[in-house]
């Protein structure tokens, strides 16, 4: 900041010197304003008058040392030690600045007159008369007061007001102002004072014994004491005299007596105890009682004065937790007290040694001592021959420079005169490049002779010892150590090994490898060592025998330090880790090093757990004898080679990694299965693995990657087979026309129960009549699939790759030897090229089709390469030398050639690294070229739950070649590529500006008629791709699918308004999308996102800069318990003020433009104009396309203009639009999910997170069906509903898969601007008949009641029938002083996104709560494939899954799904508070928690378009949750309230009154205006343009509370 101000001033001064008069005036004004501001800022600092005469240099010293004050130097008073005396005033004011004004303060040995003059009536001075000097000083202070009062009296003036209270107190109660007792014995009373007490000690703690200081402070209940004292580092040496040059003072030491005086002055000396001062310097804590201590902390050093503070600490606040398992409460409390006492004592002892053990602290507080060492000097008396020794401080660098040089002298040259000559030369000058320069070592010249003697003696001694060592130990080929051991061996014979070990352990003989150890005395000691030794000599250290505990603690500390390099190492529980090491008898340091080596992949072992928690560490370290059931077992025993067919029949097909109790890979070489057909009729259970996260990989990294690739095939096969088995179990005997990505064939009837979208499937899962499930390889004839007699049903899938996975597994299994893959020795070269750099062209130019092999990921790429290679008419590229990766793996060994000279892999970085290693090995090549792009989309693991560690993603290569010239990309895209790649990226394209973007008003506006798209159509997500295909666009692909392809023109489309994680500035998907075209790219998007920002930046790049990228040709190239409090809200009644215009203004500021819409006839316009709709399979009754005319009664007209719409009339078109935009518009985002197994894991997390531990098991003693439960359900129903059940006999069930469909007539208002561009669809209601509800309603009502009773209600709120007051009570114990992250998960299309996985999760929860199996199966079939009928509109259709909005489980089902979703993604064990309601959620986490990629997890596992918000205040169910220091208050959303005041469906005045009462109920809390400011902040988080709204809140209260006034918000529509 200072540099900026200097630069600005310099620039202004240069401007002033210019010739432009106008600019000069402006610059002068600016300089003047700056000077005024600076002087005003200085005037605001405390003012101190410095009356004593000081020199200019001393003036600068005082000013720099105390920048907090504005010091005025008058130089009007000559005095002894004038600088030190003036600094005393500054030091006093500095200490008083640290104390809150008005707090009772004890000035130990202070100047009471100074406090009186400053008007400090709250200071008590303890001024004991310890010597004559003290008496004289006290009398002088009294004289100064008398002198001051006499001057006032002589001038007929009164004591100023700010001093009046202090002087009156001194006149009436002088003992309250000053006493003459020592601070330890002071009798000052604090009866009327209740606040915190402080103390200051200005140059007075010298005379207070350090051992009594803490107790004295506690006796006065002092909170913090600030002190200042003089000290010098040189006092720790043997010097008896030390100067303090800045204040012209000195210390003289004689034994324990330390005298302080000012040089050249006759003032009295001050004598103190040296050991006592040393305690204040070195000690950290000062005990005050058996509970409390005062901890010292240095603050600053200024002008030879050290400032520090002593803070009061209550040691009872140490955490008293101790692990215990048992029922003896007395034993438990005793153990807890013992552990706490040890922890307190250890903490205090450690704090005592902070300064002594921390060299950096010593260097900081003794800056002059850094890199200085203490060297002894020797002398001898000529008369008595008595030798003397003293010490001096010398630069360590100087010492070693001399020693290293003179050690090179020959024996004759090693003389004292030569040493002295060299020392003198380097002290006087040094020669640099022939020029004499000043020496860098400022050593006192008077010491050079003595230092030279020390260096000479030390070197002489070292030379003699070397000669002695050589003469003593030249014993032939054997060393002395070997001779010694030979003698011992002859003496003890066969017992020698144990004798040798005992001798070494008892340290009777000490060896270091092959030489005896000889110790040489140190030349010097460091200042830090001397400080420690001086302190220990002067102070009696407290003795506490904690050596064993300290050693254990040190070992654990070192182990945890070793573990601290790991990610998320802060999650370690030290106690659990310690217990684990003790129980397994593992050395903590060894365990830590093993864990670090494993996690950093330095050990040849990979553990696939994500976080190094204590449980995972224990699991990884325990041996086979102590392993529990299901844990990992690492052994080295021989294992029989298992039979693959036998394993599958028993359901034991195993992973390549270490899983369960299998110690090695089970894919050993076996001749049993030689063809893929032998997989036919393998049991499905043999291919399904429920736990793939407990895998351990061993060996080099390439071997681990290859094992992981095999396991990924097993995992993909497992998930696909598991899902088809589930489909077979869930499919009912029905025949519907809807086509799906999977199919189910009924063998007996030869009918498709579920028709697949594809044909001629190569494999499937067969269900036999015995209800057994097998994987079958399918054959076809003209009638369809050829089946066997014992087959009941066949399930097929067009998505999964089980057939190819089986073939790959067969091939790879044959390559393994003893369960281990072989790694090729071929050279691997990575060719890293930018997009369009001509990788394929380069491959074709380098390949020799006679002896090389080209492998590509996709079939289209292989055909393209063959076509280009054979373009000349000569067939050189065939299916033998240009193949896809899958074809090569599946058909390995079937071709004519098995060995190739060179291997070329195109887009190799999109493959699994283990797959690349296998390809190199299988090709038997000498060199492999892997072409790829390190910045584009890498291999993506799409199997949920399967581990793919981060370091596995890095391909090990021998050489890297780069290609940085793109032949495809235009210049503007090349500009973007330069930001992503190392090195300069150039282009050959003549196109400069090629990218553009267009914001579309909504997803519905993109259709082939109104928006034809140019060129290749790309999307980011599969859901957007399916949406464009359904609207009639052709040839649509995702960005990931076209990586490596080239197109002239590209249209990139985004229809998803919610955040997509792959659309980011540094995302590889964005890079691929921008680099597919050669001429143009246009991006169509419904929202602003990072890609729009990138394109806009590229559009602004000048053509001049783009020319720089052009080239003509390619170049070569621990648990804490916080206080719990509960309080009530402060209530301040809100004034009833404001007008209608206030509400309108506020609404327009928050949602600009919404109030100007004329949407009363939007529904009529849609009916009368042509409309094009993309409809899925459904049946329409066109006879109901024209609704019967109805008389429309006039409604009340609102005075507040909002975006509210008129009620709509039910009809075919209106209902169909609602169905298309809601039920037919479900996203498809999820990846490969093993539904049943993953659902089971999710439900485990749900029960562990939310339910009380004692209620996690279902209560088998109660019945779900009872008269009471039915009566409770009936009591909640309307009379009309009960009447519909009059003819129901409850004997048989109606069709549970048949639903009715209807719409809500009133559109839901959105609090955003979408109404301006979209026609809002009505909300749909899909519901069962009341007969089905009568059966399942009481059932699920009881299950819900049991679930809510089991929830941990202290932390979780499942918002069912809760009032706002109950919400406030739940959140009322949030501590606003604790930093928290407030999280909200917002999910778009929540009901329609729910698929088979969500149903499986919900059914598993109900099953564990006690739902009967038969009814559970009935309910499941009623929600799988369902038929919707809308009798009013004449629409019939079929839906798979989705949440039914009128179901008996709609609300509670949505609630448990959102809770399960969050429990599977977030660390709920850390959660403070959480609330769930339908699709709404609100979570409070401690500040700083780490969260996973929520969007990716929600997409791939839960099929949710979700975004996670971090906020300051929560928003829950249309209400703002405001937590504050007294509790919590819940405010209804005021903007939502205003929006409702614009309602256009109010029938009459009675209806309006009912409407007002309902609004009053929900907005009751707005009557309390105490927290309007926090409400403004909360609203501002959601609506960025919202102004402070207290005026509109009061206006709402005014109108809602007055029945007559509320009527003025509406006009009678019949009279208009």
From Swiss-Prot:
CDD domains: Virgaviridae_RdRp. GO terms for biological process: DNA-templated transcription; mRNA modification; RNA processing; symbiont-mediated suppression of host innate immune response; viral RNA genome replication. Keywords: ATP-binding, Helicase, Host-virus interaction, Hydrolase, Inhibition of host innate immune response by virus, Nucleotide-binding, Nucleotidyltransferase, RNA suppression of termination, RNA-directed RNA polymerase, Suppressor of RNA silencing, Transferase, Viral immunoevasion, Viral RNA replication. Its EC number is 2.1.1.-, 2.7.7.-, 2.7.7.48, 3.6.4.13. It catalyses: RNA(n) + a ribonucleoside 5'-triphosphate = RNA(n+1) + diphosphate; ATP + H2O = ADP + phosphate + H(+). One of its GO terms (molecular function) is RNA helicase activity. Residues 72-281 form the Alphavirus-like MT domain. Heterodimer of a large and a small subunit. This protein is translated as a fusion protein by episodic readthrough of a termination codon. When readthrough of the terminator codon TGA occurs between the codons for Gln-1116 and Gln-1118, this results in the addition of the RdRp region to the replicase. This is Replicase large subunit. It comes from Tomato mosaic virus (strain Kazakh K2) (ToMV).
């Amino acid at each position: 900041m200072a540099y900026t101000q200097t630069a600005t001033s310099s620039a202004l001064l240069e401007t002033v010197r210019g010739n432009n008069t106008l600019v000069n005036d402006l610059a002068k004004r600016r300089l003047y304003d700056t000077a005024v501001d600076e002087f005003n800022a200085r005037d605001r600092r405390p003012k101190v008058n410095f009356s004593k005469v000081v020199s200019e240099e001393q003036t600068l010293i005082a000013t720099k040392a105390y920048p907090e004050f504005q010091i005025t130097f008058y130089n009007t008073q000559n005095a002894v030690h004038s600088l030190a005396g003036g600094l005393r005033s500054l030091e006093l004011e500095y200490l008083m600045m640290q104390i809150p004004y008005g707090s009772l303060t004890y000035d130990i040995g202070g100047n009471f007159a100074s406090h009186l003059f400053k008007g400090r009536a709250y200071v008590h001075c303890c001024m004991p008369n310890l010597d004559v000097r003290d008496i004289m000083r006290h009398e002088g202070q009294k004289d100064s007061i008398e002198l001051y009062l006499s001057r006032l009296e002589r001038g007929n003036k009164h004591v100023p007001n700010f001093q009046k209270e202090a002087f009156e107190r001194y006149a009436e109660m002088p003992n309250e102002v000053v006493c003459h007792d020592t601070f330890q014995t002071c009798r000052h009373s604090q009866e009327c004072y209740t606040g915190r007490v402080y103390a200051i000690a200005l140059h007075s703690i010298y005379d207070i014994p350090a051992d009594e200081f803490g107790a004295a402070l506690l006796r006065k209940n002092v909170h913090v004491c600030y002190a200042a004292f003089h000290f010098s580092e040189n006092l720790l040496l043997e010097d008896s005299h030390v100067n303090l040059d800045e204040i012209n003072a000195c210390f003289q030491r004689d034994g324990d007596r330390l005298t302080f005086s000012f040089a050249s002055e006759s003032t009295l000396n001050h004598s103190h105890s040296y050991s006592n001062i040393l305690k204040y310097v070195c000690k950290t804590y000062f005990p005050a009682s058996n509970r409390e201590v005062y901890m010292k902390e240095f603050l600053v050093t200024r002008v030879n004065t050290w400032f520090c503070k002593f803070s009061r600490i209550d040691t009872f606040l140490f955490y008293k937790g101790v692990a215990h398992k048992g029922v003896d409460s007395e034993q438990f409390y005793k153990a807890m007290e013992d552990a706490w006492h040890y922890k307190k004592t250890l903490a205090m002892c450690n704090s005592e040694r902070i300064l002594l053990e921390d060299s950096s602290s010593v260097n900081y507080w003794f800056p002059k001592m850094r890199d200085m060492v203490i060297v002894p000097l020797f002398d001898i008396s000529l008369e008595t021959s008595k030798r003397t020794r003293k010490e001096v401080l010398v630069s360590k660098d100087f010492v070693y420079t001399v020693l290293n040089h003179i050690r090179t002298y020959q024996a004759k040259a090693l003389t004292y005169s030569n040493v002295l000559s060299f020392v003198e030369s380097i002290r006087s000058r040094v020669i640099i490049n022939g020029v004499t320069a000043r020496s860098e070592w400022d050593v006192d010249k008077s010491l050079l002779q003595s230092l030279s003697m020390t260096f000479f003696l030390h070197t002489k001694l070292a030379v003699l010892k070397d000669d002695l060592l050589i003469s003593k130990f030249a014993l032939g080929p054997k060393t002395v150590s070997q001779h010694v051991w030979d003698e011992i061996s002859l003496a003890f014979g066969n017992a020698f090994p144990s004798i040798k070990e005992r001798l070494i352990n008892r340290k009777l003989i000490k060896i270091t490898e092959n030489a005896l150890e000889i110790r040489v005395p140190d030349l010097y000691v460091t200042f830090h060592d001397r400080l420690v030794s001086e302190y220990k000599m002067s102070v009696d250290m407290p003795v506490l025998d904690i050596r064993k505990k300290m050693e254990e603690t040190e070992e654990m500390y070192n182990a945890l330090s070793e573990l601290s390099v790991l990610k998320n190492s802060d999650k370690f529980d030290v106690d659990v880790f310690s217990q684990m090491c003790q129980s397994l008898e593992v050395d903590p340091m060894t365990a830590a090093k093993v864990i670090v080596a494993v996690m950093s992949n330095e050990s040849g072992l990979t553990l696939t757990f994500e976080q190094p928690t204590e449980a995972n560490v224990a699991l990884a370290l325990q041996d086979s004898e102590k392993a529990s059931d299901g844990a990992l077992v690492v052994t080295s025993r021989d294992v029989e080679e298992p039979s693959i067919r036998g394993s599958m029949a028993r359901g034991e097909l195993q992973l390549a990694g270490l899983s369960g109790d299998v110690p090695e890979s089970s894919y050993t070489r076996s001749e049993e299965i030689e063809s893929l057909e032998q997989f036919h009729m393998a049991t499905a259970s043999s291919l399904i693995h429920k736990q793939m996260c407990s895998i351990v990989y061993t060996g080099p990294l390439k071997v681990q990657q290859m094992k992981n690739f095999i396991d990924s095939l097993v995992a993909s096969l497992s998930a696909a087979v598991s899902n088809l088995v589930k489909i077979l179990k869930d499919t009912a005997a029905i025949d519907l026309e809807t086509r799906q990505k999977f199919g189910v064939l009924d063998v007996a009837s030869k009918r498709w129960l579920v028709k697949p979208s594809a044909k001629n499937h190569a494999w499937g899962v067969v269900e036999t009549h015995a209800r057994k499930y097998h994987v079958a390889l399918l054959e076809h004839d003209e009638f369809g699939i050829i089946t066997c007699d014992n087959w009941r049903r066949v399930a097929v899938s067009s998505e999964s790759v089980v057939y190819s996975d089986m073939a790959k597994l067969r091939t790879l299994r044959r390559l393994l030897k003893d369960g281990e893959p072989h790694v090729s020795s071929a050279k691997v070269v990575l060719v890293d090229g930018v997009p369009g750099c001509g990788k394929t062209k380069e491959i074709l130019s380098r390949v020799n089709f006679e002896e090389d092999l080209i492998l590509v990921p996709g079939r289209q790429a292989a055909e393209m390469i063959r076509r280009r290679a054979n373009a000349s008419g000569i067939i050189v590229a065939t299916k033998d030398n240009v193949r896809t990766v899958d074809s090569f793996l599946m058909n390995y060994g079937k071709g004519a050639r098995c060995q190739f000279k060179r291997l070329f892999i195109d887009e190799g970085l999109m493959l699994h690294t283990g797959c690349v290693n296998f390809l190199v090995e299988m090709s038997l090549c000498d060199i492999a070229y892997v072409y790829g792009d390190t910045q584009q989309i890498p291999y993506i693991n799409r199997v949920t739950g399967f581990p793919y560690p981060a370091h596995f993603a890095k391909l090990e290569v021998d050489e890297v070649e780069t290609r940085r010239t793109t032949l495809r990309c235009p210049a503007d895209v090349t500009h973007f590529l330069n930001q992503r790649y190392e090195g300069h990226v150039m282009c050959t394209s003549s196109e400069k500006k090629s990218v553009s973007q267009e914001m579309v008003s909504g997803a519905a506006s993109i259709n082939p008629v109104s928006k034809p798209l140019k060129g290749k159509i790309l999307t980011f997500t599969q859901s957007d791709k399916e949406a464009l295909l359904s609207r009639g666009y052709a040839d649509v692909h995702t960005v990931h699918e076209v990586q490596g392809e080239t197109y002239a023109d590209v249209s990139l489309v985004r229809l998803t308004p919610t955040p997509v994680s792959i659309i980011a500035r540094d995302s590889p998907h964005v890079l691929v999308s921008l680099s597919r075209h050669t001429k143009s790219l246009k991006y169509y998007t419904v929202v602003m996102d990072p890609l729009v920002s990138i394109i806009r930046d590229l559009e602004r790049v000048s053509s001049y800069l783009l020319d720089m990228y052009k080239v003509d040709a390619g170049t070569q190239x621990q648990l804490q318990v916080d206080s719990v409090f509960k309080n009530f809200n402060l209530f301040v009644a809100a004034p009833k003020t404001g007008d209608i215009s206030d509400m309108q203004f506020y609404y327009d500021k928050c949602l600009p433009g919404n109030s100007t819409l004329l949407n009363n006839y939007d529904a009529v316009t849609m009916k009368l104009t042509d409309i094009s709709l993309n409809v899925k399979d459904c049946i329409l009754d066109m006879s109901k396309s024209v609704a019967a005319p109805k008389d429309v009664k006039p409604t009340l007209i609102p005075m507040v203009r909002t975006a509210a719409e008129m009620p709509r009339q039910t009809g075919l078109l209106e209902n169909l639009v609602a169905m298309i935009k809601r039920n037919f518009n479900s996203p498809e985002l999820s990846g490969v999910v093993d539904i049943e197994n993953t659902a089971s894991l999710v439900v485990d997390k749900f029960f562990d997170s939310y339910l009380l531990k004692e209620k996690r098991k279902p209560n088998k003693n109660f019945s779900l069906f009872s008269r009471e439960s039915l009566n409770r359900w009936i009591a909640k129903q309307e009379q009309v509903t009960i009447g519909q059940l009059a003819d129901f006999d409850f004997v048989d069930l109606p069709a549970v898969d048949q639903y009715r469909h209807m719409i809500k007539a009133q559109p839901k208002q959105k609090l955003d601007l979408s109404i301006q561009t979209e026609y809002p669809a009505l909300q749909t209601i899909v519901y069962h008949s009341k007969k089905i509800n009568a059966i399942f309603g009481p059932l699920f009502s009881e299950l819900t009641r049991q679930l809510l009773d089991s929830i941990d209600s202290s932390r979780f709120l499942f918002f069912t029938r809760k009032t706002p007051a109950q919400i406030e009570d739940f959140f009322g114990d949030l501590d606003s002083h604790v930093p928290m992250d407030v999280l909200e998960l917002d999910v778009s299309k929540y009901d329609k996104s729910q698929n088979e996985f969500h149903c499986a999760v919900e059914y598993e929860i109900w099953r564990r709560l006690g739902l009967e199996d038969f009814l559970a199966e009935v309910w499941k079939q009623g929600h799988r494939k369902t038929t919707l009928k809308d009798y009013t509109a004449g629409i019939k259709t079929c839906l798979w899954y989705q949440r039914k909005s009128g179901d008996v489980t709609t609300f509670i089902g949505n609630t448990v799904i959102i809770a399960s979703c969050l429990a599977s993604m977030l660390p709920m064990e850390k959660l403070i508070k959480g609330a769930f309601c339908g699709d709404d959620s609100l979570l409070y986490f401690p500040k700083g928690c780490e969260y996973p990629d929520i969007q990716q997890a929600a997409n791939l596992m839960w099929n949710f378009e979700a975004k996670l918000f971090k906020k300051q205040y929560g928003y829950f169910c249309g209400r703002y949750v405001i937590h504050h220091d007294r509790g919590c208050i819940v405010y209804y959303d005021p903007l939502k309230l205003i929006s409702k005041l614009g309602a256009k469906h109010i029938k009459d005045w009675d209806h309006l009154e009912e409407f007002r009462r309902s609004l009053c109920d929900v907005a009751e809390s707005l009557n309390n205006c105490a927290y309007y400011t926090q409400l403004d902040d909360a609203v501002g988080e959601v609506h960025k343009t919202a102004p402070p709204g207290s005026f509109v809140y009061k206006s709402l209260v005014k109108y809602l509370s007055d029945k007559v006034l509320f009527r003025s918000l509406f006009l009678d529509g019949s009279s208009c």
